[in-house]
Amino acid sequence: QRQMCIRDRDQINERMKQLRALSQSLHCLVLTVTQTDAAAYKTRVITRSNFSDDKRKLAHVTGMVGLNQTDEEKELGVMRLNWVVRREGAFTETTCVNVAGCLALGTPAIVSCW
């Protein structure tokens, strides 16, 4: 079981390195998603500490954005985005930008800025 877990982590790390190399060689945006830990369900803003499984994921990205939403915000169609990791420029993990719109139609609209 533990051996398989380590192999899975190594495969994910290799995939993240390959995606980073692809973005650099083609000078293009590469998007991917990842899951947080169970503690993220109880936090208002996702931070680096919510990715405890394998920190190597964070080492390969140029930027990682957290998607944050309470039940009330979900009913209102509002979501908060924050930088979890950002290689270029200063950032604060707990500073959020609010996004509202109709996500079912794929039309989020920024209603505040960082």
Identify the meaning behind each predicted range.
Residues 3, 10-30, 38-114:
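C-terminal regions of RecA-like/P-loop NTPase motor modules
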Residues 33:
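Conserved D-loop beta-strand region of ABC ATPase nucleotide-binding domains
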